[in-house]
């Protein structure tokens, strides 16, 4: 049976492309040759199955008063059960948690991730006889240039970049507390349109790094 990797995330997992000139199809979503989840599948090979679960606007545990069903915690049981059995759960969330209307800070976002991972680890969706394996990824911090993009800045709020810079510290602490794995994706390139979404190169960088980690994690 193939080793199953489920990737839960937001628009950076769905593959949103803020700069159509950076996307081969010149659209608003990177294609199957560009998205990090698809690149990860190709890098790992046929012995693995990589499933992408990306939704633009998704948060860890914080309901959005404007857009419904954005917090993955509220339906994570059904989501995980629909993809059983799972060998490794990869979660890259947090960017949308920084929105001003959600009233968060880095510590609270870290607690949100902790609550989500704790819940996920209790769901009966893991390979029989195997312990839950989770990789928490801190998304690249939002660039200060985001504040110059009127519509995006209004949606996110002026403090979003600063809040996002503090997420990795708390995600790392959460991973250590729960005995799961952690990756800081700050090394991945983001675009200079909204300063939040990965470029094609950023997707490639992320896929390459995760592909290095997966065999080590699953060998434990």
Language-model-detected regions and their locations in the chain:
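Serine-esterase "nucleophile elbow" of acetyl-processing enzymes
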Residues: 1-54, 61-65, 78-81, 89, ...
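Generic structural signal for helix capping and beta-alpha/helix-loop junctions
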Residues: 15, 58-60, 144, 192
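Residue-level "edge-of-site" marker
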Residues: 54-56, 188
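Short active-site-adjacent helix-start/loop capping segments
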Residues: 58-62, 98-100
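Alpha-helical cap/lid subdomain in secreted, periplasmic
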Residues: 70-220
């Amino acid at each position: 049976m193939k080793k199953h990797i489920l990737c839960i995330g937001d628009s950076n997992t769905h593959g949103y492309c803020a700069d159509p000139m950076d996307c081969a199809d010149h659209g608003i979503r990177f294609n199957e040759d560009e998205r990090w989840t698809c690149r990860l599948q190709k890098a790992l090979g046929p012995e693995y199955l990589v499933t992408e679960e990306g939704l633009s606007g998704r948060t860890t545990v914080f309901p959005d008063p404007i857009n419904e069903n954005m917090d993955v915690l509220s339906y994570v049981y059904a989501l995980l059960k629909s993809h059983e059995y799972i060998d490794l759960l990869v979660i890259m969330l947090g960017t949308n948690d920084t929105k001003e209307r959600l009233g968060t800070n880095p510590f609270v976002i870290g607690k949100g991730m902790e609550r989500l991972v704790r819940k996920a680890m209790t769901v009966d969706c893991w390979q029989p006889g195997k312990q839950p394996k989770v990789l928490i990824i801190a998304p690249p911090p939002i660039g200060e240039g985001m504040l110059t993009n009127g519509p995006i800045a209004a949606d996110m709020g002026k403090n979003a970049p600063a809040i996002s810079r503090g997420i990795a510290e708390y995600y790392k602490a959460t991973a250590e507390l729960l005995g799961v794995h952690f990756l800081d994706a700050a090394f991945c390139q983001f675009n200079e349109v909204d300063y939040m979404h990965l470029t094609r190169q950023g997707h490639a960088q992320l896929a390459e790094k995760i592909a290095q980690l997966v065999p080590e994690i699953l060998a434990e």
